[in-house]
């Protein structure tokens, strides 16, 4: 935002008719012969009243034709000075000054002209000569002081200004002090002195004008505009004051309001003010500079009002018109791009501006670039930036060279960015370590503890996150970031009523907030219907379990939540496969209800199964219970279990069964699951299956995850010689690796690929141990939080009854919310 250039608005001694002392000098300098000349006398009177052109034309013509007397030469210099013809004064002085009788008035005129032309040294020499002739002349001393200030000789200017106190009227002396301070960059001291001058001479319009100039220079824009109402200022200065007042509203609009209801009041005032100014200035050719500047500054008011599309539209219009958009307005445009989920454009602007002036970059500027890079999926660049920022700022700094140290807020910004970069890089353990250290050393910092709770939740510890947030709730109970994070934790804990209450409050209070919108979106998705589909298609397989040409599909449609905890569902399933004894087909139609509450999940299902031997009633009850953040106990019981092998169903054999399992999940990187599953077949066979599965993350980065999996499983059956695969005893050992690699990601849209490889062994009673080989490749797509779908091509060689069979097939799944 442009500042008022006080040096261009400074008052000078250019117009001598404003100063009584100068008029007295001129009157005394007129020779008797000139006074006797009536025409010449009339021209001089005209000049004194401000019309200098006639006498200047007369003297110029006479000088060219007849030459001028010494007194006329002195008059010529004086009147040219009145007219503000500084270059002409200097030329006349150089030509005739040496021949003239030295008087303080002529010397002052020449000194003033040199000063206006920024020729400081000749001006200072003339001021000193004039002061030697009239040391008690306050006007000369004042001119000398102001020229010293212009020349950058601040110390001497202050010394000479102190000497002038006894020579000048108090108001004039304070005004001189103000000029010296302003020239040296002490703008607030200048305003203080101008305030004293104004108090001493409230009716002096010159002092009032300079006071307004200093108010504007110090960005005290609204008082400056109000004080200017009684003055006759140049239109360009008046427009600048109006623009500054509107720009001040823009600056204030970014400051947190006292209450949430008032947060847009100032921004709306700024927009209304700009609408008025733009309408007023648009048709005026002489006001186009002010008009264009107002268009640029208005971008800030639009940004503060969260009219991001308007910010981008106006910014692009300015660019298309070839307008030069200053850096601060470009940052506004970049912020709007980031809000509108166009991080590539935001990163380009932030990166260019930060690189252009690295020494002027603030921690806030680097934070903007960090999030633009992160949201543009330039995670490695963002991590490097966070590392640099964390090392750039010291923990504490000295203020005003005092011996005590003050805490440095920028240091905390750098450390927070570093921790956030670990989250983006999926190094949650390091992010937790860093945030724990920061939060425990600053327990009263609610923001740090909210960030720590978010990492707890990402690591699979919603109860620990809930406890952390509860501890800091008393610091600022109505904090929006706190309520949003509490909402996500409630969702993780299946506290649906709490989720709705928090989401309602947050979106009502801050509908423009991106974080609030994302939270509300998550809540809306929770309240949608859900469609689940999974299936498989055999390509080249002839194993005894699934048969050849096998195909299966299962679908379930869940209703939106009912009374917070309930969902109804209906399902359909179809399986087919070709076996030696014929083609097997199974059709299922099911319906049921689901209950979800804190720590508990229950699902009950009634199904009609038709597998070629009439319609049969199937029942299932499944449940799990969370003991804490690490342990979960679950199980199910079923009549006509859906896990019954298709080959058994084809031969008219059904099974009842169940399972019991216990899962331990240390964090997002490590888990174990032990299970046992007994089954009773209608042919009298009793089967007991057991297993232990483990997963350990080996590597993780922003775009990849590598997990090692281990499967230990076995079974035993009470009968042999049955028409389905039924080993007396068997045992499987299968370690494998799974690599998940992100191909594309843009906010909630992601496309990834998966690689699987495993090699182990299989032992079956009465047969030799033989190897198992597994390979797989798949891809997944997730979109906007409502769609998640994947497909995988799998290859397996598995021994059955001592013979290794090859199985090639495709599995697929889809989850869609609507």
Model-predicted regions and their roles:
Residues 1-35:
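Gram-negative bacterial Sec-dependent N-terminal signal peptides
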Residues 4, 9, 62, 96-98:
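Short, low-complexity, charged/polar intrinsically disordered tails
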Residues 13, 17-18, 29-33, 98, ...:
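Short, intrinsically disordered, low-complexity terminal segments
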Residues 15, 19-24, 35, 116, ...:
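Compositionally biased non-globular segments, especially hydrophobic aliphatic-rich helices
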Residues 27-30, 34, 79, 113, ...:
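N-terminal leader-region detector that preferentially activates on the first domain or presequence
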């Amino acid at each position: 935002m442009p500042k008022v250039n006080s040096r261009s608005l400074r008052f000078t001694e250019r117009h001598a008719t404003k100063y009584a002392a100068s008029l007295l000098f001129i009157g005394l300098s007129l020779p008797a012969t000139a006074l006797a000349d009536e025409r010449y006398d009339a021209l001089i009177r005209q000049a004194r009243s401000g019309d200098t052109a006639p006498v200047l034309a007369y003297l110029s013509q006479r000088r060219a034709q007849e030459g001028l007397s010494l007194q006329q030469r002195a008059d010529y210099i004086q009147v040219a000075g009145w007219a503000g013809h500084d270059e002409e004064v200097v030329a006349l002085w150089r030509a005739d000054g040496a021949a003239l009788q030295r008087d303080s008035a002529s010397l002052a005129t020449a000194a003033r002209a040199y000063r206006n032309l920024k020729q400081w040294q000749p001006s200072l020499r003339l001021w000193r000569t004039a002061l030697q002739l009239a040391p008690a002349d306050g006007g000369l001393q004042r001119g000398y002081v102001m020229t010293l200030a212009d020349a950058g000789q601040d110390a001497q200017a202050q010394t000479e200004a102190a000497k002038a106190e006894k020579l000048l009227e108090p108001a004039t002396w304070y005004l001189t002090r103000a000029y010296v301070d302003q020239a040296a960059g002490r703008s607030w001291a200048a305003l203080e002195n101008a305030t004293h001058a104004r108090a001493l001479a409230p009716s002096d319009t010159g002092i009032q004008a300079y006071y307004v100039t200093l108010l504007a220079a110090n960005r005290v824009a609204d008082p400056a505009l109000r004080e200017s109402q009684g003055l006759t200022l140049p239109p360009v200065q008046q427009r600048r004051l109006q623009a500054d007042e509107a720009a001040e509203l823009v600056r204030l609009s970014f400051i947190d309001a006292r209450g949430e209801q008032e947060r847009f009041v100032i921004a709306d005032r700024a927009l209304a003010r700009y609408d008025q100014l733009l309408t007023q200035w648009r048709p005026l050719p002489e006001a186009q500079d002010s008009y264009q500047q107002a268009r640029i500054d208005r971008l800030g008011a639009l940004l503060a009002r969260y009219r991001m599309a308007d910010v981008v539209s106006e910014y692009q219009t300015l660019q298309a018109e070839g307008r030069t958009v200053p850096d601060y307005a470009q940052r506004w445009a970049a912020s709007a791009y980031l809000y509108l989920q166009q991080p590539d454009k935001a990163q380009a602007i932030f990166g260019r501006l930060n690189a252009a002036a690295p020494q002027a970059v603030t921690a806030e500027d680097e934070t903007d670039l960090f999030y633009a890079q992160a949201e543009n999926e330039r995670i490695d660049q963002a991590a490097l930036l966070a590392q640099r920022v964390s090392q750039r700022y010291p923990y504490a700094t000295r203020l005003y060279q005092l011996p005590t140290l003050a805490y440095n807020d920028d240091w905390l910004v750098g450390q927070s960015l570093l921790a956030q970069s670990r989250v983006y890089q999926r190094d949650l353990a390091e992010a937790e370590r860093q945030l724990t250290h920061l939060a425990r050393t600053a327990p009263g910092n609610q923001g740090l503890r909210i960030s720590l709770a978010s990492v707890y939740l990402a690591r699979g510890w919603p109860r620990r996150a809930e406890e952390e947030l509860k501890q800091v709730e008393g610091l600022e109970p109505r904090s929006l970031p706190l309520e949003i994070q509490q909402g996500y934790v409630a969702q993780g804990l299946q506290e649906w009523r709490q989720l709705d209450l928090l989401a309602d409050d947050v979106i009502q209070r801050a509908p423009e907030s991106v974080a609030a919108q994302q939270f509300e979106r998550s809540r809306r998705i929770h309240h949608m219907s859900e469609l689940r589909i999974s299936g498989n298609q055999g390509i080249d397989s002839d194993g005894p379990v699934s048969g050849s040409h096998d195909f299966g599909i299962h679908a379930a449609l869940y209703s939106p939540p009912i009374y917070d905890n309930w969902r109804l569902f209906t399902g359909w399933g179809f399986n087919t496969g070709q076996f030696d004894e014929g083609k097997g087909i199974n059709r299922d139609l099911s319906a049921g209800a689901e209950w979800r509450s804190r720590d508990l999940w229950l699902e009950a299902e009634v199904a009609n199964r038709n597998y070629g031997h009439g319609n049969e009633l199937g029942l299932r009850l499944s449940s799990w219970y969370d003991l804490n953040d690490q342990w979960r106990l679950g199980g199910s019981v079923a009549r006509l279990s859906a896990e019954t092998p298709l080959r058994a169903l084809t031969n008219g054999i059904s099974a009842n069964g169940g399972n019991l399992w216990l899962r331990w999940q240390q964090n997002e990187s490590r888990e174990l699951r032990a299970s046992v599953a007994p089954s009773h077949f209608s042919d009298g066979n009793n089967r007991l299956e057991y297993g232990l599965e483990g997963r350990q993350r080996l590597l993780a980065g922003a775009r990849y995850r590598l997990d090692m999996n281990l499967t230990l499983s076995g079974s035993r059956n009470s009968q042999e010689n049955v028409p389905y695969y039924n080993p007396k005893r068997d045992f499987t050992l299968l370690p494998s690796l799974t690599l998940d690699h992100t191909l594309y990601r843009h906010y909630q849209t992601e496309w990834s690929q998966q690689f699987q490889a495993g090699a182990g062994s299989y032992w079956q009673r009465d047969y030799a141990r033989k190897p198992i080989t597994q390979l797989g490749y798949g891809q997944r797509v997730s979109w906007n939080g409502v769609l998640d779908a994947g497909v995988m091509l799998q290859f397996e060689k598995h021994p059955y009854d001592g013979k290794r069979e090859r199985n090639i097939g495709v599995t697929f799944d889809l989850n869609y919310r609507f």
